[in-house]
A protein has these predicted regions:
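PLP-dependent enzyme catalytic core of the Aspartate aminotransferase-like
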Residues: 324-328, 333, 337-367
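N-terminal "arm"/small-domain region of PLP-dependent enzymes with the aminotransferase-like
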Residues: 2-66
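Short acidic capping loops at alpha-helix termini that bridge into adjacent secondary structure
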Residues: 36, 86-90, 110-113, 157, ...
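Conserved PLP-binding catalytic core of the aspartate aminotransferase-like
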Residues: 285, 295-328
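Active-site pre-lysine segment of PLP-dependent enzymes
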Residues: 147-156, 169-192, 196-229
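PLP-dependent aminotransferase class I/II
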Residues: 71, 219-303
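Phosphate-binding glycine-rich loop
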Residues: 65-113, 131
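PLP-dependent aminotransferase-like
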Residues: 106-163
Length: 367
């Protein structure tokens, strides 16, 4: 007699749908038998791996029979020195997604409330549902966070608030002044996660002093990643800065070897490669101008973005447009699952990759 294993699963897991990542190039090659594919779907760094990282990783290969440093001592030391934080404030993750889930698992219990914005990063609702907690989704304001409404949504049952700045998938950005005022309204018992996965693409003068805020607001956890501007998406390494007591709780639950040896070394190396980071930011700046000028010339509405992607309104259901682009060898990201069925999110690539997308979209929409 068979067993219904779904009935044995935790309540929050039963109706959970897996995270849908951007379509891999290899998958499209298998499906359509085509080559020369351009992938602009997952907000990856188009420059490829930094030369400094390639060299460092090659030298490390002989040590892969050993377990990694479970505490990431040298990476934490480098992060603390670079950003002026204490090593006791740092928690390392297998990408920042790992940390987002870890924070929720530490602080959120069944039936607690978790607040996030409409059109927020899809990992937030997945984490909340997995814990069988209550999601409080605050309607967006101009595709971004309505901080006034989010503050008003806080109740005695609220345990956690997720805020992405810049926001993914819309690219909207909150000023330091607006965030500071919001944090002052949040009760001390409510944790706030500030997800800054794309902060390196923001003009430095506009960025929030988020790490310094942790000393003013001990309930704040700031998460960042090496997957975007630093070009380490395939190695999966991120970090958070929080009150030392919060970091201690996170590290109780964190898997001891969640960052592998190559990831730790790569992150430590690229953190010192200012030239690579500057090139990544400049490439993104030029590519963003290329795509926004194209949209303006074609009369396509888009959401001004502070990230490394542009979200474009197709003026029609975007699903068929996405499929036609796939047939032309261009992978972008449909975001109907974010409540945006007419939009496609397009990662900023190299100039020639952006041109491939624009030529393909011309063929789909205008010919």
């Amino acid at each position: 007699m068979g067993c219904d294993f779904t009935a044995l699963a935790n309540l929050g897991i039963r109706a959970l749908s897996p995270y849908q990542a951007g379509k891999p190039v290899e998958e499209l090659e298998r499906e359509l038998g085509i080559s020369n594919i351009v992938k602009l779907a997952s907000n990856e760094n188009p420059l490829g791996l930094a030369a400094s990282v390639q060299q460092a990783l090659t030298a490390e290969l002989s040590g892969l029979t050993r377990y990694p440093d479970a505490n990431g001592f040298y990476l934490k030391q480098a992060l603390a020195e670079r950003f002026g934080v204490d090593e006791a404030q740092l928690t390392l993750g297998n990408g920042s997604n790992d940390l987002l889930e870890l924070i929720a698992r530490v602080f959120v219990s069944e039936q607690d409330e978790v607040i996030y914005a409409e059109h927020a990063f899809i990992v937030y609702p997945l984490v909340v549902q997995a814990l069988n907690a209550k999601a409080v989704v605050v309607p967006a304001s101009e595709w971004g966070h309505d901080l006034t409404a989010m503050a008003a949504a806080i109740t005695e049952r609220t345990k956690l608030i997720f805020i992405a700045n810049p926001n993914n998938p819309t690219g909207t950005f909150l000023s330091a002044e607006a965030l500071d005022a919001f944090l002052q309204q949040v009760p001390a018992h409510v944790m706030v996660v500030l997800d800054e996965a794309y902060t390196e693409y923001v003009e430095p003068s506009l960025r929030s002093p988020s790490f310094a805020w942790v000393n003013r607001f001990p309930n704040l956890v700031v998460c960042r990643t090496f997957s975007k501007a630093y070009g380490l998406a395939g190695l999966r390494v991120g970090y958070s800065v929080s009150d030392p007591q919060v970091a201690g709780l996170l590290n109780r639950l964190r898997q001891p070897f969640n960052c592998n040896s190559l990831a730790l070394l790569a992150a430590q190396t690229v953190l010192d490669d200012a030239e690579y980071l500057a090139a990544a930011v400049e490439t993104n700046h030029r590519g963003m101008a290329q795509l926004t000028e194209y949209c303006q010339a074609r009369g396509l509405a888009y959401i001004p973005s502070s990230g490394n992607f542009l979200t474009i309104d197709m003026g029609r259901p975007a699903g068929p447009v996405y499929q036609q682009l796939l047939a032309l060898g261009v992978i972008v990201r449909p975001i109907a699952g974010y409540g945006m069925p007419d939009h496609l999110r397009v990662s900023i690539g190299l100039a020639q990759e952006n041109q491939r997308f624009m030529d393909a979209l011309d063929e789909v929409l205008f010919r």
